Amino acid sequence: MANILYITCNLKPREQSRSLTIGNEFLKRYSERHPEDRIDFLDLYRDPIQRIDTDVLNGWGKLRTGASFDLLSEDEVRKIGRIGALADQFVATDKYVFVTPMWNLGFPAELKMYIDTVCVVGKTFTYTESGAVGLLRGMGKKCLHIHSCGGFHCGSADDHSVPYLKSVMNFMGIEDFRSVVVEGMDALPHRAEEFMDKALAESREAAALF
């Protein structure tokens, strides 16, 4: 049995969201093939994602000097605890599915906040004399990024979403990365149905291989 973490970052309801529609098709087909797997859901807009703020930095600084949690403020303990819980959940996961829209050539800020909570020294990567090393390497972990763009950006220098997420996953040691992207539906609305059908088919293929 594998643990799946299905991470969404979208304010729209599913029926109005292209990426969530494709993600739902993937989930349906994947669940049919792997009914024994456990799927956990994380909605980055509705679940509390703790940003790294002054309390977090101050608390981490105290812990690095050898201080115990008893010497941290209530806010520092609460915030660092939430970040630790998210990082532990990430480490314990076998397969990750990110579902995002493109916003201004990237993705919503909530996803960057989440990435900052799971890229943790000593948990997902470490530093060596030769550079940073991902601690999740060699564990067979996989990542799928389902993404939507109104224009045509995939593979261009303007795309700061899919390549960035792929780079971050590799940084932590997750080398098996694939993506399903629907794009151009706003640029060429008369072909929107065609583009969506293609992405849905790709999501079904991804479910068979994931």
UniProtKB/Swiss-Prot annotation:
Its EC number is 1.6.5.-, 1.7.1.17. It comes from the Bacteria. InterPro entries: Flavodoxin_fold, Flavoprotein-like_sf, FMN-dep_NADH:Q_OxRdtase_AzoR1, NADH:quinone_OxRdtase_FMN_depd. It catalyses: 2 a quinone + NADH + H(+) = 2 a 1,4-benzosemiquinone + NAD(+); N,N-dimethyl-1,4-phenylenediamine + anthranilate + 2 NAD(+) = 2-(4-dimethylaminophenyl)diazenylbenzoate + 2 NADH + 2 H(+). GO terms for molecular function: electron transfer activity; FMN binding; oxidoreductase activity, acting on NAD(P)H as acceptor; oxidoreductase activity, acting on NAD(P)H, quinone or similar compound as acceptor. PANTHER family: FMN-DEPENDENT NADH-AZOREDUCTASE 1, FMN-DEPENDENT NADH:QUINONE OXIDOREDUCTASE. Quinone reductase that provides resistance to thiol-specific stress caused by electrophilic quinones. Also exhibits azoreductase activity. Catalyzes the reductive cleavage of the azo bond in aromatic azo compounds to the corresponding amines. This is FMN-dependent NADH:quinone oxidoreductase. It comes from Trichlorobacter lovleyi (strain ATCC BAA-1151 / DSM 17278 / SZ) (Geobacter lovleyi).
